[in-house]
Amino acid sequence: MKVKTRFAPSPTGFLHVGGARTALYSWLFAKNQGGEFVLRIEDTDLERSTQEAIDAIIEGMEWLELNWDEGPYYQTKRFDRYNGLIDEMLADGRAYKCYCSKERLEALREGQMANGEKPRYDGKCRDHAHDHPADAPHVIRFRNPTEGSVVFDDHVRGRIEFANTELDDLIIRRTDGAPTYNFCVVVDDWDMEITHVVRGEDHINNTPRQINIYKALNAPVPEFAHVSMILGDDGAKLSKRHGAVSVMQYRDDGYLPEALLNYLVRLGWSHGDQEIFSLEEMIKLFSLDAISKSASAFNTDKLLWLNNHYMRSLDPAYVAKHLAWHMADQKIDTSKGPALADVVTLLAERCNTLVEMAAQSRYLFEEYEAIDEAAAKKHLRGVAAEPLTLAKAKLAALDSWTTEALHELIEATAAELGQGMGKVGMPLRVAVTGLGQSPGIDAVMALVGKERVLARIDRALAYIEARMAAE
């Protein structure tokens, strides 16, 4: 049997991290088993579904590179298929028309709740639908079994059993003729030959109802794995108040997809004590049975740590492609300046996100607006004029503009003045970057370029002269 899984989001909002983890688990299992992964858009909620949400889901999946083998399929394009089956079920008694008004159903619900009962349809129209005019407004309900139970072995939670007496007769077609979610899902999984359904634990109560529909259609029942919810660091269900919950918000905040995928796979799945997983390792090691039943808490600090790891360990040229988006977002013109891969190499050790990296690289591409006041007060005093002037003369004559040659030049300048490296390096750092902290100034100058370095030293010398005159 070929394994086939699916990710089937409803396009009523962005792709959130819980959905992304579900998609990842489903995708990994398919790849681990040599199977196929399907993307399906469950857009039967016509009032809430939007094209904007569909675009956001697809964009998120593409950014994570969770590529699908089939799809995207859209439920709204399959209404004829669903309604054809419903008509067949209606004709042979597997479904029936229900004429109960909203007012009656609401009163029924309120009465049951007042008596401490579980709200459920009482089956009034189950055997009396013929008492109403055929063209009167109605819904179609599935005739759920009234005896026995539904049992399934969940890959995460083990054996789960529901008595059929706990289940009511589900509406499978609304008054407006639109088929409902629980019915469409079953038909889709049947038609698309889905063998394993990975989804959130909030779908557990849907599962017995869907299994009964599979059986009524004489369709094979897939296996299920219901994963636990993701909590915020305060133990509450993850929500917007915990920070970013949209996958693309993590992109915007400067995370690499590899970091987010690595983090998400560990939110409920583990392989020993291993924390770092390449995508190839995830595919090789992943199994549904190793998913934890317990809810997992989202820890932003750990995600930042992983992001820093991938910024440092991935090919700088690859990281640079993602950095380019953030440079443009921060309106930094990179057309005149160092290669972005070199910027990644320079700054990866010092940054946790690509947003930070873009911000910290600005002086490599454009002139800084002002020198940091605290850094200038400490390092651009009158005594700094001599080492800056000597260093500038040597830099102007330097033919080999490399990190190594620049390091040797700073050493030679310090030796000639009989001073420590810091007495030359720190004034140069403030002059070239406008900041009190940066990576090694030799590496920085190598990327800034000779012309800009000399001009910035002139700017710093003018600053020192003006400061001394004011004193």
UniProtKB/Swiss-Prot annotation:
**Where is motif 'KMSKS' region found?**
237-241
Spans through the membrane = none
Entry GO CC: cytosol
Which PROSITE patterns did the record assign? Answer: AA_TRNA_LIGASE_I (PS00178)
Keywords, ordered alphabetically: Aminoacyl-tRNA synthetase, ATP-binding, Cytoplasm, Ligase, Metal-binding, Nucleotide-binding, Protein biosynthesis, Zinc
Q: What does the cofactor field's note say?
A: Binds 1 zinc ion per subunit.
Give the location of motif 'HIGH' region in residue numbers.
Answer: 9-19
Biological processes, Gene Ontology terms: glutamyl-tRNA aminoacylation
- Name the positions where ATP binds: 240
Per the record's keyword annotation, is Repeat included, yes or no?
no
Name the residues that bind Zn(2+). Answer: 98, 100, 125, 127
| Listed cofactors | Zn(2+)
The reaction(s) catalysed by this protein are:
tRNA(Glu) + L-glutamate + ATP = L-glutamyl-tRNA(Glu) + AMP + diphosphate
Documented EC number(s)? 6.1.1.17
- Name where it's found: Cytoplasm
On whether Zinc is a keyword of this UniProt record, the answer is yes
Subunit details for this protein? Monomer.
Concerning its family, UniProt says: Belongs to the class-I aminoacyl-tRNA synthetase family. Glutamate--tRNA ligase type 1 subfamily.
Give the HAMAP family listed for this entry: Glu_tRNA_synth_type1 (MF_00022)
- Quote the protein name from its UniProt record: Glutamate--tRNA ligase
